[in-house]
Structures are given as C-alpha cells and as structure tokens.
Amino acid sequence: MIAAGAKSLLGLSMASPKGIFDSNSMSNSRSVVVVRACVSMDGSQTLSHNKNGSIPEVKSINGHTGQKQGPLSTVGNSTNIKWHECSVEKVDRQRLLDQKGCVIWVTGLSGSGKSTLACALNQMLYQKGKLCYILDGDNVRHGLNRDLSFKAEDRAENIRRVGEVAKLFADAGIICIASLISPYRTDRDACRSLLPEGDFVEVFMDVPLSVCEARDPKGLYKLARAGKIKGFTGIDDPYEPPLNCEISLGREGGTSPIEMAEKVVGYLDNKGYLQA
C-alpha cells in the first residue's frame, strides 16, 4: 500500500495471494509481481515511466506479462480488433475465491418464483462463503438494458446482453445467477453456447400458467387479459419450456424457496463448483 501523502516514486512488491498461485503440491514459491508506481497530484496511483517515456516492465506470474495475441479480427460490426491475453486467468481467480465460476440461468413464466429462488440461492451461497451476483430481468432494464422495449427483437437483445455479462461474471470466477423469463429456447441456447461445457446450469421454474396468474404479484396478467399489455408471455406470446435443463423446480407441491435453493446448491456441490 502507498503511504498517505507520498509524493515520490515508490517500489511496490506484492507477493502472490495465498491460494492463488501456491499449491500444496509445490514447495517452491512462484515469482512475485513488481510494479513501479507513484502518486499523482490528485492523490491517485499511477504507473511511473522510464526516462525514455515508456512504461517499465511489469513482471508477473512466472515472468509473463499481459500480451496482445492473435490476428486482427472482425466480430459483428467491430473491425480490426484483437483479443488481449493476460497472465492471470480464470483458474487463478477461482483459486482465489475457492469456487468455480458458472451461470445459473433461472427461466420461467412471470410469477413462477424466479426472483424469489435467486435471492434464496444467493443468500444460501453467501452463508457458505461463496461469491455470487444476481442479474435480475427487471433490474437490468433499470440500467444496462433501459434502451430496450419488449418487442421480439429487443427481447432477444435483452437476453443476449445478459448472457454476455453473465459470461464475464463466470470468467471472473463468480457464480452468476441470471433470473429472467427468457421465453425462447434459441435465446437461452445461445447463452449456453457462450460458456464451457457444464458451466451453464439451466433451472426451469416449472409452474403452471394458472398458478402464476393466480399469484400475479405485479398485476401484469390482469393488465394483459385486459388488453393493456401486448405480447405478454403466457397470454398472447409463447413460452418455450426447456427440453434438457439441468434442474426443474415446481412449487405446486408446496416446496419452499429454501428447499428449492438447497436443491440447486446440492447440484453445484456435486458438480464441484463450490471449491476451486
């Protein structure tokens, strides 16, 4: 840490955090990260430069530094871009957190209990010392997806964006819980394809429309039946149930949110996601 009020160039030596780069099977320690830093006039930390104006080498794991690898490519409408590699990878972040990053994709009709399950699951994993984050379908429309409507093309883009963000969370080693109606199989399958095999866990809230409509926690079914909401899933727009989801849950039998969350946690534990 840089001492408060430091004005001159400082040499910082940051040893590898325990559990990231060290293992019980390795007796000799890995190399440390050495960064040359200084404090600017506004108090912010910046990298210092060599006399020739270049940024000094940042020694990293086993002597490797962040690199720009691979040819220039075109992805969608983005041209002349290159993927930037870094020596700290997903496996290192997972060791730091002692868990494996993945996406728990909770899908189902409005009122099926998706958000309730997501919160119960988040709390249960938190109590186990596991780092999670919820991407809730309504919440993301307050910011990231506030520019999207509920037209078919915008709903597809909504799911695509959430899938990409969820992938980043998983790559960071975090257990990401995405809770969205996501009515179309093609959109959900596209999100699944973004992640390595097994890292996308689809949880289907298999609750009948009649039960969801009877609950109607937001009053949306009533508005849809009155014709005030068009294209509402389950009323005048289809919901396509998963064909091969990892977990299927239903509350018609009186199963509590805690019991459902325990089932998901049990699945994650059995698959090895709750340890690095």
From Swiss-Prot:
Coiled-coil boundaries: none
One Gene Ontology term of the molecular function aspect: ATP binding
Keywords noted in UniProt: Amino-acid biosynthesis, ATP-binding, Chloroplast, Cysteine biosynthesis, Disulfide bond, Kinase, Nucleotide-binding, Plastid, Transferase, Transit peptide
Transit sequence range: 1-38
Effect of residue 182 to C/F: No effect on catalytic activity
Major enzyme class: transferase
Biased composition (Polar residues): 62-74
Tissue-wise expression: Expressed in root vasculature, root tips, leaf epidermal and guard cells, pollen grains and funiculus of developing seeds.
Region (Disordered) residue spans: 46-74
Domain of life according to the entry: Eukaryota
Swiss-Prot/TrEMBL catalytic activity: adenosine 5'-phosphosulfate + ATP = 3'-phosphoadenylyl sulfate + ADP + H(+)
Disruption phenotype: No visible phenotype under normal growth conditions. Apk1 and apk2 double mutant exhibits a semi-dwarf phenotype.
Participates in a stacking interaction with the adenine ring of adenylyl-sulfate (site feature) positions: 150
Location of the active site: 182
GO CC annotations on file: chloroplast; plastid
Subunit comment: Homodimer; disulfide-linked. Interacts with APK2.
Function: Catalyzes the synthesis of activated sulfate. Essential for plant reproduction and viability. Required for the production of glucosinolates.
Membership in a protein family: Belongs to the APS kinase family.
Name under which the protein is recorded: Adenylyl-sulfate kinase 1, chloroplastic
Species: Arabidopsis thaliana
Lineage: Eukaryota, Viridiplantae, Streptophyta, Embryophyta, Tracheophyta
Recorded name of the encoding gene: APK1
